[in-house]
């Protein structure tokens, strides 16, 4: 299955708890970390919920 790389570009400080949980669910938590995850509709939805905190890296 295809994978995508996601980089955290925003801090979870002063963000709602639900956004923090989505960030942890993606495997992130600290600034400028990059993780490689499977490209599924669930992951795409999580990325869409946090456009101000994560970016897709080529």
From Swiss-Prot:
The keyword Ribosomal protein applies. GO terms for molecular function: structural constituent of ribosome. GO terms for cellular component: large ribosomal subunit. InterPro entries: Ribo_uL30_ferredoxin-like_sf, Ribosomal_uL30_bac-type, Ribosomal_uL30_ferredoxin-like. One of its GO terms (biological process) is translation. It comes from the Bacteria. Keywords: Ribonucleoprotein, Ribosomal protein. Belongs to the universal ribosomal protein uL30 family. Part of the 50S ribosomal subunit. This is Large ribosomal subunit protein uL30. It comes from Novosphingobium aromaticivorans (strain ATCC 700278 / DSM 12444 / CCUG 56034 / CIP 105152 / NBRC 16084 / F199).
